[in-house]
Structures are given as C-alpha cells and as structure tokens.
A protein has these predicted regions:
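A generic structural signal for short
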Residues: 8, 14-15, 37, 67-68, ...
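Asp-based, Mg2+/Mn2+-dependent phosphohydrolase catalytic module
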Residues: 28-31, 45-151
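Proline-centered loop/turn at the N-terminus of a beta-strand
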Residues: 36-38, 112
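Conserved phosphate-coupling serine/threonine residues in phosphotransfer and NTP-handling enzymes
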Residues: 41-43
Length: 151
C-alpha cells in the first residue's frame, strides 16, 4: 500500500517536469526519419506515462518501464528488452542517459552510450561514446542504406 501511495504521488506531482532542451525536436526528427526509438525508464508505468505526457514528448515505438524487467538499472535488463522489442541488437542501439545507473545499464547491455548532463563522478563515464551538456548538440541522419549517423 505504501508503494502504491508513493507511486500515486510521483505520478501526480509533475510540477517542474520538463523535457530536456532539444529532446522534443530530436525525437520528432527520429519519427520523421523513420528511426526507431524507445523510452527505457526505471519508473513505473503510471509515473512514466504521466511524466512523458507532461513533458510533451512524442510517443515512442517502445516503452520499457520497471514492471517489465526483473532487475532495474544499473543492470542491463531494461536496455536489452528495449533493443529486443525494437528488433535490434544492443550494439545497434544508442542509449541517451543523464543518470549514473542508466549509463552503467547501457554500457552493461553493450549499447553505445551518450551521457547528457551526467554527473562528473559517474562510474565508467570515460567509456561512453559521447559526453554532452545538451541534446541540442546531437545531429542524427539516416543514410540511404539505412545506417544512422550521430554527430
């Protein structure tokens, strides 16, 4: 009962929840370009859906929440499931994370990882593909052969 109450509070207390700068434009571009993407979160479905709606993010093809995996971040399970549901191998996926547990999870899953505003003391931060301060620094293009280039 206590968890349900806390979950309700988290799902309804959405003041201050906003999309990261550049997130809406980036995700909209992915949709237009036909590039599959997922939201993979440690939050429960009610909390994740409420925050997703408040942030005004486009709808993902795949939504992985805490209920869908046995082990949460920093274990790789959530990102492995996200890749599977997208029909991709983990090494074909790019994880964009701001939390240390998420960075570790993405690396453990074998995905490429972009850390955005991750704390400087994030373990294994030196192993990620890119460290950025804003999603506005990312450009994504889909090549005629289907390859996706991230710069």
């Amino acid at each position: 009962a206590e968890f349900t109450r806390l979950e309700y509070i988290e799902a309804t207390e959405t003041e201050g929840i906003t999309a990261l700068p550049g997130a809406i434009a980036l995700l909209s571009h992915l949709n237009k370009a036909g590039i599959p993407w997922a939201i993979v979160t440690s939050g429960s479905m009610p909390v994740a859906r409420a925050r997703h709606k408040i942030a005004g993010l486009p709808a993902p093809e795949v939504f992985v929440t805490a209920e869908r995996v046995k082990r949460g971040k920093p274990e790789p399970d959530a990102y492995l499931l996200g890749a599977q549901l997208l029909g991709l191998a983990p090494q074909e996926c790019v994880v964009v994370e701001d939390a240390p547990a998420g960075v570790l999870s993405g690396l453990a899953a074998g995905c490429h990882v972009i850390a955005v505003n991750a704390p400087a003391d994030t373990p294994r931060l030196n192993e990620v593909d890119l460290v950025l301060h804003s999603l506005e620094q990312i450009t994504v293009t889909k090549q005629p052969n289907g390859d996706v280039i991230i710069q």
